[in-house]
Regions:
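Beta/alpha (TIM)-barrel catalytic core signal, keyed to glycine-rich beta->alpha loops juxtaposed to Asp/Glu
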Residues: 130-391
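Acidic (Asp/Glu)-rich catalytic clusters
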Residues: 20-22, 74-88, 115-120, 190-194, ...
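Alpha-helical scaffolding within the catalytic cores
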Residues: 11-19, 77-78, 111, 183-189, ...
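Active-site mouth loops of central-metabolism enzymes
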Residues: 30-44, 96-105, 148-153
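A short, structured active-site edge motif that brings together acidic residues
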Residues: 87-101, 125-131, 203-206
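Short acidic capping loops at alpha-helix termini that bridge into adjacent secondary structure
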Residues: 29, 87-91, 121-125, 174-175, ...
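N-terminal binding-site loop/beta-alpha segment at the start of enzyme catalytic domains
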Residues: 1-91, 108, 163, 169, ...
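CE4/NodB-like, metal-dependent polysaccharide N-deacetylase domain
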Residues: 107-128, 166-167
Length: 391
């Protein structure tokens, strides 16, 4: 099956909803994702797919060092510019600092490499991909263990953030932001930054069955634009992020019902909900490889396709009586990023996100770690289940 269909008509980029960042910059609400979900077939087609997305009207590209394809995306951008589809100033290109480069001295070289790979002189947005240096190699299985992983340590993060602000001042990056923050870690960051150096954007998991409504409202109140990845429930996510407890957004009865009522597909219903959130002030990232799907994903950011009643069926109305379809169905548990104490003390799937192990300083974490090891040894000696396990 051919992915690219040049007979599919493009969308006028001026029709796509724009979100205003804190400094006044306009950012297209809909971003074309470039993560290929460790899928080699999609990886091979990525250059043509991104060029086609630009032809069809996408102007916001969501990239990352961790996706290992920024050179490919860069070739697509270059091809689109050389063929007259777009000029650089019309694009909003976003990339992310990978966890492996979370030492202060590595931040600027990492950005320079991203710019080289993308063939650009500047980024419109640069994010800290995750709030700590824990990482897994691309394609890792779900049970991989990083023995050097640590929890969120605020003083360490702020050293990285200082380098991010230097990049902004240099002009190599127009705006800076974060990804995968919790509300608590975001509160700490905002506490310790001035107006110029605040993040203007936070990318986070958002889809109909995982809406994070309180956090979204908090970010907007702080003039930080929230934007969602896994906007369709990521049906092709890597195996390490698949668990029996997960639910499929597009198969939910309400999503199916609204699709039937409107004549839209389930993906279009999900993205229309994303588009209409908070008066069109929440961004979304979606990846597709066929021309028809690329266009339909983008088109959702051009119109109010859901009636108020249909929107409320998905979103709820803010009352306890009508919570919508949000089931707190988080897809990224992040177990590949767990630090020793998260595993040591009986972690659960929310350990990465529930803020029970975040620390202001390295000294605070060191004290906690010593106590945790001692506690675990006593626990292992005395608790019935653990005595059996280790006997």
């Amino acid at each position: 099956m051919d992915l690219i269909n040049k007979n599919v008509e493009s969308i006028d980029p001026a029709m796509v909803t724009q979100i205003r960042l804190a400094d006044g910059t306009l950012m297209p609400q809909a971003a074309m994702g470039t993560f290929h979900s460790d899928n080699p077939d999609l990886e091979a087609a990525m250059e043509d797919v991104i060029t086609e997305a630009i032809r069809l009207g996408y102007r916001h590209l969501d990239c990352a060092t961790a996706y290992q394809n920024e050179e490919v995306v860069g070739r697509a951008i270059s091809k689109a510019i050389e063929s007259g589809l777009v000029i650089r100033e019309e694009l909003f290109v976003l990339s992310k600092l990978w966890n492996k480069n979370m030492k202060p001295e590595e931040v600027i070289p990492a950005l320079d490499q991203t710019l080289k790979d993308l063939g650009l002189e500047y980024l419109d947005m640069y994010l800290v991909h995750w709030p700590w240096p824990n990482y897994h190699e691309p394609g890792s299985a779900g049970d991989v263990v990083n023995t050097h992983a640590v929890p969120y340590i605020h003083e360490d993060f702020m050293k990285v953030w200082e380098k991010m602000t230097e990049l902004k001042k240099s002009g190599k990056v127009k705006n800076i932001g974060t990804s995968n923050q919790t509300q608590k870690t975001m509160e700490l960051l905002l506490r310790d930054t001035d107006h110029f150096n605040r993040p203007s954007y936070n990318q986070m998991e958002l889809h109909p069955l995982f809406q994070q409504q309180d956090f979204v409202k908090y970010l907007i109140s702080e003039k930080v634009v929230p934007s969602g990845y896994m906007s369709l429930g990521s049906p092709r996510r890597p195996g390490r992020d698949r668990f029996a407890e997960h639910q499929a957004d597009m198969l939910h009865p309400i999503i199916q019902q609204v699709a039937g009522e409107t004549g839209m597909t389930p993906p279009e219903v999900c993205l229309s909900w994303a588009h209409q959130r908070e008066q069109n002030n929440v961004g979304y990232v979606a990846m597709a490889e066929r021309s028809e799907w690329i266009k339909s994903n983008l088109a959702c950011a051009t119109k109010e396709a859901l009636s108020n009643n249909q929107y409320i069926k998905i979103n709820g109305d803010g009352s306890d009586e009508n919570l919508g379809i949000n089931t707190n169905n988080r897809l990224i548990w992040g177990q590949v990023f767990f630090w020793p104490e998260a595993r040591l003390l009986g972690h659960d799937r929310d350990m990465l996100w529930n803020d029970v192990q975040i620390f202001e300083t390295e000294l605070d974490y060191h004290k906690f770690r010593q106590a945790a090891v001692k506690f675990y040894e006593i626990w292992k000696e005395t608790a019935v289940d653990l005595r059996i396990k280790y006997s």
